[in-house]
Amino acid sequence: MKMGLLVLFSLTLYGVGNDLVAPDFSEGLQGAKLEKKDERGDQVVFHFKTGLSSKKFSAILKKNLGPAWRAQKLKQEDMIFAARRGRSAGAGVNLTVYQHPADKGIRIRVIHLKSKSGTNHRAEVAVIKGD
């Protein structure tokens, strides 16, 4: 009985049984200006302009997502996509992918593009469903 209650309680903490709502960054993020929003098939991509370093941007994004979201092992297709974005933008790239344990069907792919010529960095936050 105690074990059953413990399992039920732990599942409730992660939101199992509730439909996880995909994050929406339409309002922007602290220290980053939303430039545009693209919707392509199963994903919504938010494009930001920021003066924040990759580390600071990631900290703000993680705080916005909440403590249950976890960084995931990178998939090869994400790494290839990020490398191409970096090459086309002439920028250094930092890639992180987050996933919520309650819903493995939603991933957040974050690409931070560090400009080689200054402090005008860009970030792309893609909310990917059904991956």
Give the ranges of each region predicted by the language model.
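Detector for methionine-enriched segments
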Residues: M1-M3, M79
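Sec-dependent N-terminal signal peptides
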Residues: M3-T12
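An acidic-aromatic pocket/loop used at catalytic or ligand-binding sites
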Residues: Y14-D131
